[in-house]
Amino acid sequence: MSIISPQDVKRLREETNAGFGDCKKALSAASGDFELAKKKLREMGIASAEKRLDRDAKEGRVFSYSNNIHAGLLLVSCETDFVALNHNFVNLGNSLIKELVESGRSFPTASQELELKNLAATIKENIQVKKIFITEIQSNEFVKIYLHGEQSKIGVLVKLKVDDFSKTEDKMFQNFAMDLALHVAAFAPIYLGNDDVCPNYIKEQEEIFAKQLEFSGKSESILKGIVAGKIKKHLAEISLLEQSFVKNDKVTVREMLEEISKAISSKIEIVEFKYLRIG
């Protein structure tokens, strides 16, 4: 039987980031063979990672990447904010989103899932890909991405269509694109515009508001007006184009869009946006 020295365990630990006890166990099982011990650690880790899947993973971070063809956001969860700052966790997340964007895929491959399991085994936390958003970029479209804070707990992607694409170099346009991404991060709209809201959802909200006013004693015509007003206000809260702009609450996002379009002499449209948040 091979004698496993503390130096051997230390070396394996430095190379794999696995725990001291696990390294010692793996080296013993591998009779001191380092490569076999690494394989043992991966096997042990993947088995234990499966057991951790039912543990809460309420922390994590959002990763992003963009090229001239695609852009995307990736939300990877973990159990602690300490791990969310771990360089191995961050490096893997950045690598995954880059590979996804460059391939145009919106799902991880088997090898990428194995990488995640291996990392979960090393760090000993439940690590999972929760959300992936990949979008194609057309020749007249501009993408702005914003990640909030050191831990990137909020990620925003906004895609704009610009008639005269040369105007995307304009400082006013650049500032607006950044402000728009900040706006989405701050107000978390659900829909782009009122036309995108599901009719059944609006009907359900109308019924809720009507129920709240059921015993108000007001006439039916007045109640209809009140409900309509409440619906309008509610839609303005959840639809990006109807929200008050983050840098000027006297105008809506729609109005600001028209103002900037006029200022740079090129029509700007919001094609789509995505908001991802940890927790």
UniProtKB/Swiss-Prot annotation:
One of its GO terms (cellular component) is cytoplasm. This is Elongation factor Ts. Keywords: Cytoplasm, Elongation factor, Protein biosynthesis. It is found in: Cytoplasm. NCBIfam families: tsf. Belongs to the EF-Ts family. Residues 80-83 are annotated as: Involved in Mg(2+) ion dislocation from EF-Tu. GO terms for molecular function: translation elongation factor activity. It holds the Pfam family EF_TS. Associates with the EF-Tu.GDP complex and induces the exchange of GDP to GTP. It remains bound to the aminoacyl-tRNA.EF-Tu.GTP complex up to the GTP hydrolysis stage on the ribosome. InterPro entries: EF-Ts_dimer_sf, Transl_elong_EFTs/EF1B, Transl_elong_EFTs/EF1B_dimer, Transl_elong_Ts_CS, UBA-like_sf.
